[in-house]
Amino acid sequence: MTNFERVKKFMETFGQEIKEKAEFPSDKIASLRHDLINEELDELKEAMNNKDIKEVADALTDILYVTYGAGHAFGINLDKCFKEVQNSNMSKLGLDGKPIYNEKGKVMKGPNYFKPNLDKFVV
């Protein structure tokens, strides 16, 4: 069972709306999902500012949890989307098979990069 599936079980148990196809939920649910993600991001910022690694772990896990919940609320299978994005990200290597970084250390797109095709999961 994936973490995305575990969150679905939680949502089913607690009577939360789950969409089976990609579509917007009600404004109330969309707003709730937005607020939950922002709340966890704020907790992450605070934990990082306090250099509290335990709270960083908690906030990062909660961000995943509420993001997976948002995926279910919008009917978007994040397991499938993640796999597609992972494949796209791995295409960023340079011609020599090595990563390309900018001055800040961000991985840049190599010449064989391809954009993830998420249409198949939301259309």
Predicted regions, residues:
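Flexible "arm" and connector segments at domain edges
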Residues: 1-123
